[in-house]
Amino acid sequence: MNRENAKPFAHSKHYLYFWQKYSDQMNENVLAKLKILAESAKYDVSCSSSGTVRRNQSGALGNTVGGWGICHSFAEDGRCISLLKIMLTNYCIYDCAYCINRRSNDIPRATLSVSELVDLTIEFYRRNYIEGLFLSSGVVRNPDYTMERLVRVAKDLRLVHKFNGYIHLKSIPGASRELVNEAGLYADRLSVNIEIPKEENLKLLAPEKDHKSVYQPMRYIQQGILTNKEDRKKFRHVPRFVPAGQSTQMIVGATTESDKDILYLSSSLYQHPTMRRVYYSGYISVNTYDKRLPALKQPPLVRENRLYQAD
């Protein structure tokens, strides 16, 4: 999926139409939060609505057709579809050099409550502006606190509002097995971003992070999917667990990894049967004041494209 098809929902014509027509009917504070958090979410390209089907059920809301794309994309019959791509909050306890939402940046900040985000999703979905939700978040307090709030959003959508649209949740690195497993009961896809392929380079740009906190939730997701497949062979009505599998994202060009290094890691990830897609995101110079980062005039989009071709 190219960068053009991964535009954030906040830049869409549907969003602008919604803003102009319904802003007088909605809480202005919520709409202001929506604008900030949709903008903050745009740097994450690792979302896709392909790979799952949720058929409408009696008394339920909507349905998802497998094979459709991310944010703004097109179905095989030519129809344009959208996901609401948003963050729960862009506050973060981490100070990662490559991230626009890093703790030390002086940027507009916002946090949506669980009920506000659920209501927004349902409102947009009822008006046919979106096919589903791509939800990520900055980390506040600790990984489990943040992950629990993400799970509550998905759980309320599924159980309270009978939402049958697509849900992609970003699992928080360092989150507990219990919360990851609960998320898998309500999300179509879970993803944990590796971000920087080599741990020594991750430590250089994000000293508070490590690869263990990323790979551990990946293992939880894989184990949950494989166990669920076996259970469904024995028991017909076992609920599906992350039916669209998992994905991850790596930043390209922020550190010294070669294409060979990146593709070697991707190849090892694809050895796991639950890894559906590795996304590559050309580094965007958002924090030019940080001398640990390369001085790039523009993202390495050709390199990004070549990695997708090789992948």
Describe every region a protein language model picked out.
Residues 182-189, 267-271:
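Short, surface-exposed basic-aromatic patches at helix termini and helix-loop junctions that form
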Residues 102-117, 125-150, 156-177, 184-235, ...:
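Core AdoMet radical
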Residues 90-102:
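Local cysteine-cluster metal-coordination motifs and their immediate loop/turn environment
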Residues 83, 96, 135, 192, ...:
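Conserved, mostly hydrophobic/aromatic
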Residues 194, 198, 213-289, 302-311:
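Conserved C-terminal portion of the radical SAM core fold
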Residues 114-121, 176-181, 258-267:
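Short, acidic/polar
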Residues 2-91:
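Flexible, acidic/Gly-rich N-terminal and inter-domain linker regions that tether
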